[in-house]
């Protein structure tokens, strides 16, 4: 049994795909004295019912770059950490019903080409070669993304967690953070098992992120602009 730590360089609050990705990448870049706290089981929050779509399409350079990196990571992660993971590269065809939409696709394609992605503008006459049942009478064209696909979010989370553990990161499940305080230049994360002093705190609490964010407002933090709603 691992003793509960009292210090760390970074404490991550939240054990979904964002939290485990943060821990994995911190460890990969040498910040191995990092800890993840999860109030329940890994993926028990918003991650377990995520759709798992893996597009590279975006009109934002930064988001496209992040998605490109993610797709590259997913291709080799299962083998790297020795954890089975359902990741399917299926390709996708996005449809344009106007010339303005085609201009948006052309801009996206240009950004993608610069970042090394093989996005392709499709003429209407060529689109049925990809999807023969497509109705094309009202289309202006399309954008084909051969790298689009889907992934199992729970398996991805567990793979990232395993990779982080392999590099020395620590994960504590069923250990909710219950508050934070500040002592000098350090943060103190409070849990029922004890307090952890650290340099940095990462709020990866998913649909609890707004609630966790409120803890930081007395120290200059801002409200996380989100609301949690129940649905079927």
Can you say where each PLM-predicted feature lies in the sequence?
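A conserved short coil-to-beta-strand element within the FAD-binding core of flavoproteins
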Residues: 125, 173-187
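Helix-loop-beta segment of a Rossmann-like dinucleotide-binding subdomain
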Residues: 4-7, 85-94, 108, 115, ...
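Beta1/beta-strand and adjacent pyrophosphate-binding region of the FAD-binding site
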Residues: 4-18, 35
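Glycine-rich FAD pyrophosphate-binding loop
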Residues: 27-48
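Conserved Rossmann-like nucleotide-cofactor binding loop
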Residues: 18, 42, 208
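Core beta-strand elements of the Rossmann-like FAD/NAD(P) dinucleotide-binding domain
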Residues: 5-8, 190-200
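Dinucleotide-binding Rossmann-like beta1-alpha1 core, especially the glycine-rich loop
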Residues: 52-130
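Central helical "cap/lid" subdomain
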Residues: 195-232
């Amino acid at each position: 049994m691992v003793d509960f730590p009292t210090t760390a360089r970074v404490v991550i609050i939240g054990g979904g795909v964002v939290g485990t990705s943060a821990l994995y990448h911190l460890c990969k870049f040498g910040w191995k004295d990092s800890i993840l706290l999860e109030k329940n089981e890994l993926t028990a929050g918003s991650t377990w019912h995520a759709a798992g779509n893996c597009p590279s399409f975006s009109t934002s350079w930064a988001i496209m770059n992040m998605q490109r990196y993610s797709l590259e990571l997913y291709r080799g992660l299962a083998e790297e950490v020795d954890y089975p993971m359902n990741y399917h590269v299926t390709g996708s065809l996005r449809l344009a019903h106007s010339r303005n939409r085609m201009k948006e696709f052309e801009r996206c394609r240009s950004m993608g080409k610069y970042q090394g992605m093989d996005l392709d503008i499709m003429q209407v006459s060529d689109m049925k070669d990809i999807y023969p049942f497509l109705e094309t009478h009202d289309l202006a064209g399309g954008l084909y993304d051969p790298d689009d696909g889907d992934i199992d979010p729970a398996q991805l989370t567990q793979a990232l967690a395993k990779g982080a553990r392999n590099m020395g990161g620590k994960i504590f499940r069923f250990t909710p953070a219950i508050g934070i305080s500040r002592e000098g230049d350090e943060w103190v994360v409070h849990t029922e098992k004890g307090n952890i002093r650290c340099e940095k705190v990462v709020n990866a609490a998913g649909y609890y992120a707004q609630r966790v964010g409120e803890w930081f407002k007395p120290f200059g933090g801002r409200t996380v602009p989100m609301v949690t709603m129940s649905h079927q």
